[in-house]
UniProtKB/Swiss-Prot annotation:
Compartment(s) where it occurs, according to its Swiss-Prot or TrEMBL record: Cytoplasm
Function, in words: Catalyzes the conversion of 4-hydroxy-tetrahydrodipicolinate (HTPA) to tetrahydrodipicolinate.
Predominant location: cytoplasm
Keywords, in A-Z order: Amino-acid biosynthesis, Cytoplasm, Diaminopimelate biosynthesis, Lysine biosynthesis, NAD, NADP, Oxidoreductase
Gene that this sequence comes from: dapB
Pathway this chain belongs to: Amino-acid biosynthesis; L-lysine biosynthesis via DAP pathway; (S)-tetrahydrodipicolinate from L-aspartate: step 4/4
Positions contributing to (S)-2,3,4,5-tetrahydrodipicolinate binding: H150, G159, T160
Protein name from the UniProt record: 4-hydroxy-tetrahydrodipicolinate reductase
UniProt source species: Granulibacter bethesdensis (strain ATCC BAA-1260 / CGDNIH1)
GO MF term list: 4-hydroxy-tetrahydrodipicolinate reductase; NAD binding; NADP binding; oxidoreductase activity, acting on CH or CH2 groups, NAD or NADP as acceptor
Active site location: H149, K153
Domain of life from the UniProt record: Bacteria
């Protein structure tokens, strides 16, 4: 396509909190082909934006679909987008191993940008986290991740927190699943050497706060990102939808979009 303006961007779940922001950002930077509404939703479609009956028809009408819906829709959306040959910008968190497998399989057929967080600042934090973990040995520096979100958030720890944990684990040359300690309860004994701990807080209207702490006996180092407006995620997702045009099938991340790898 000759210009970004001609790129047709579809929005899955366009009447939700994120969906409405995505419509605004996509309309400013490209062409909104339309969107879907959550089944049973009483929220009206944004004015002037076509509402499609299902993900299949939206995929057929779009060059890229931005999807921040829910983990329960991932496998059905993967099938629809692969059939239509449409790029997928996926920001849904809380995916199961089966969901992640579906994402990997569709990436062999269409380009997929999958990220725990589309805010540029968070992705810089992820890159720094891996470098810091490589430089700060786990036998001296305990790694702890604390995140807080609004009271309605369903999954815990957040996708971004898990992404931070994976970055720390990669920097230390281990698998996160082997060293994760999430939500300690009661008397659990001393902290295990090399563990990566998680604590999740929920309350109020917090958009998203994440802190990675490296704690040694003689110093503490903290890396924090605070999101004050969901628009940061929406802008990043639309940036990814524009960037992915013309890319071959594959599984990409926001790091690729930002040219950080």
């Amino acid at each position: 396509m000759s210009t970004d303006r001609s790129i047709r961007i579809g929005i899955a779940g366009m009447a939700g909190r994120m969906g409405s922001l995505l419509v605004e950002e996509a309309a400013a930077q490209g062409t909104v082909s339309g969107g879907t509404l959550r089944p049973g939703s009483n929220s009206p479609a944004p004015v002037g934006i076509p509402a499609f009956a299902d993900i299949n028809t939206l995929a057929e009408a779009s060059d890229a679909v931005i999807d921040f819906t829910s983990a329960s829709t991932v496998q059905a959306h993967a099938r629809a987008l692969s059939k239509a040959g449409t790029a997928w910008i996926l920001g849904t968190s809380g995916l199961s191993p089966a969901d992640e497998k579906a994402v990997e399989e569709i990436a062999a057929l269409v380009p997929v940008v999958y990220a725990p967080n589309f805010a540029p600042g968070v992705n810089l934090v992820l890159a720094l986290a891996e470098k810091m973990a490589a430089a700060l040995p786990g036998n001296r520096y305990d790694a702890e991740i604390v995140e807080m979100h609004h009271r309605r958030k369903i999954d815990s720890p957040s996708g971004t927190a898990i992404g931070l944990g994976r970055a720390v684990a990669a920097g230390r040359g281990v698998m996160l699943e082997e060293v994760i300690e999430s939500g300690r309860h009661g008397h659990v004994g001393p902290r295990q050497p090399g563990a990566i701990g998680f604590a999740a807080l929920r309350g109020g209207q917090v958009v998203g706060e994440h802190t990675l702490l490296f704690a040694a006996d003689d110093e503490h180092i903290a890396l924090t990102h605070r999101a004050f407006d969901r628009r940061a995620f929406a802008r990043g997702a639309v940036q990814a939808a524009l960037w992915v045009q013309g890319k071959p099938p594959g599984l990409y991340s926001m790091m690729d979009v930002l040219g950080m790898r």
